[in-house]
């Protein structure tokens, strides 16, 4: 019953997250934070409604776990964006969250597929999200490094080196948190 309302909450959230990602590219920080925040609030409201309806934390099935993935990705994205102002991070986190939302929408059979007990821990979903963000940031640092090594012409690399360093620092921080 509660999953039948998911599409409403999901569509509203994804539209708001996408608006926030677009606003980040347009240097409209206030709009980016506001729309991403409203999207997170709407999505979290659905998680809370599900929690109250089920009378337990929604962590037992694959579908419920993907809800947490979809929630934590834009949250991690907005945190990184607020600190380092990387315009692409909100687009990336929104895209990943949208993939998990779509899996929940298009594969309803996972809503009842129970996870093994070890994966029902409240630490499992944040752990996976933090690892995904860590690998994404470290991958971006590798791409930036390859660009600087083989394609960048000229001596103006101070800004690019700082970005690469920051991506590495944040990626390793997320990796450490994930452990």
Region annotations inferred by a language model:
Residues 1-179:
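Polytopic transmembrane helical bundles with strong interfacial aromatic enrichment
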């Amino acid at each position: 019953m509660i999953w039948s309302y998911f599409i409403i909450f999901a569509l509203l959230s994804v539209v708001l997250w996408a608006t926030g990602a677009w606003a980040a590219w347009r240097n409209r920080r206030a709009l980016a934070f506001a729309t991403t925040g409203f999207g997170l609030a709407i999505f979290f409201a659905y998680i809370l409604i599900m929690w109250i309806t089920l009378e337990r934390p929604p962590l037992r099935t694959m579908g419920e776990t993907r809800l947490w993935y979809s929630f934590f990705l834009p949250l991690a994205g907005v945190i990184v964006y607020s600190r380092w102002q990387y315009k692409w991070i909100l687009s990336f986190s929104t895209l990943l969250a949208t993939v998990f939302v779509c899996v929940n929408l298009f594969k309803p059979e996972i809503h009842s597929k129970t996870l093994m007990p070890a994966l029902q821990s409240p630490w499992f979903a944040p752990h996976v999200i933090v690892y995904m963000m860590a690998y994404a940031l470290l991958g971006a640092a590798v791409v930036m490094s390859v660009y600087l090594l083989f394609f960048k012409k000229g001596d103006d690399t101070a800004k690019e080196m700082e970005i690469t360093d920051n991506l590495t620092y944040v990626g390793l921080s997320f990796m450490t948190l994930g452990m």
